[in-house]
């Protein structure tokens, strides 16, 4: 973690992957967030028939960890510090992490199935 002017910064490396049917998903590659602030990771996908949309986290040297998922008939799902927003019309998925912590520094993947 880097410290600058008394602030701690978290680096969320964002990478994307689709876990079935070779569908495409897109998201930004890098996000820097000050510890304690909220962060939003965005993802777009192509398959409007997807039933489930997932967010995974991968810490250095570890395997993928399922953070949360949302059914395609839902608009929002909240679980502790995580909020998932789904706009099925625009094929847009967002993950909001409230009160970011050093343990949130990782690679994040969105996926659809």
Swiss-Prot record:
Residues 23-113 form the Ig-like domain. Pfam families: V-set (PF07686). Residues 1-22 form the signal peptide. Disulfide bonds join 43-110. Keywords: Adaptive immunity, Cell membrane, Disulfide bond, Glycoprotein, Immunity, Immunoglobulin domain, Membrane, Receptor, Signal, T cell receptor. GO terms for cellular component: T cell receptor complex. Transmembrane segments: none annotated. It is found in: Cell membrane. It comes from the Eukaryota. SMART domains: IGv (SM00406). GO terms for biological process: adaptive immune response; response to bacterium. InterPro entries: Ig-like_dom, Ig-like_dom_sf, Ig-like_fold, Ig_V-set, TCR_variable_domain. Gene3D superfamilies: Immunoglobulins. Glycans are attached at residue 42. V region of the variable domain of T cell receptor (TR) alpha chain that participates in the antigen recognition. Alpha-beta T cell receptors are antigen specific receptors which are essential to the immune response and are present on the cell surface of T lymphocytes. Recognize peptide-major histocompatibility (MH) (pMH) complexes that are displayed by antigen presenting cells (APC), a prerequisite for efficient T cell adaptive immunity against pathogens. PANTHER family: IG-LIKE DOMAIN-CONTAINING PROTEIN-RELATED, T CELL RECEPTOR ALPHA VARIABLE 1-2. Alpha-beta TR is a heterodimer composed of an alpha and beta chain; disulfide-linked. The alpha-beta TR is associated with the transmembrane signaling CD3 coreceptor proteins to form the TR-CD3 (TcR or TCR). The assembly of alpha-beta TR heterodimers with CD3 occurs in the endoplasmic reticulum where a single alpha-beta TR heterodimer associates with one CD3D-CD3E heterodimer, one CD3G-CD3E heterodimer and one CD247 homodimer forming a stable octameric structure. CD3D-CD3E and CD3G-CD3E heterodimers preferentially associate with TR alpha and TR beta chains, respectively. This is T cell receptor alpha variable 5. It comes from Homo sapiens (Human). The lineage of its organism: Eukaryota, Metazoa, Chordata, Craniata, Vertebrata.
């Amino acid at each position: 973690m880097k410290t600058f002017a008394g602030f701690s910064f978290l680096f969320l490396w964002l990478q994307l992957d689709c876990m079935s049917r070779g569908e495409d998903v897109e998201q930004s590659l890098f996000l820097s967030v000050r510890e304690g602030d909220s962060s939003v990771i965005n993802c777009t996908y192509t398959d409007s028939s997807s039933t489930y949309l997932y967010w995974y986290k991968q810490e250095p040297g570890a395997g993928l960890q399922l953070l949360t998922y949302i059914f395609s008939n839902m608009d929002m799902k909240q679980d502790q510090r995580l909020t998932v927003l789904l706009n099925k019309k625009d094929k847009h998925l967002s993950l909001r992490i409230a009160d970011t912590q050093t343990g949130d520094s990782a690679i994040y993947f969105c996926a659809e199935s």
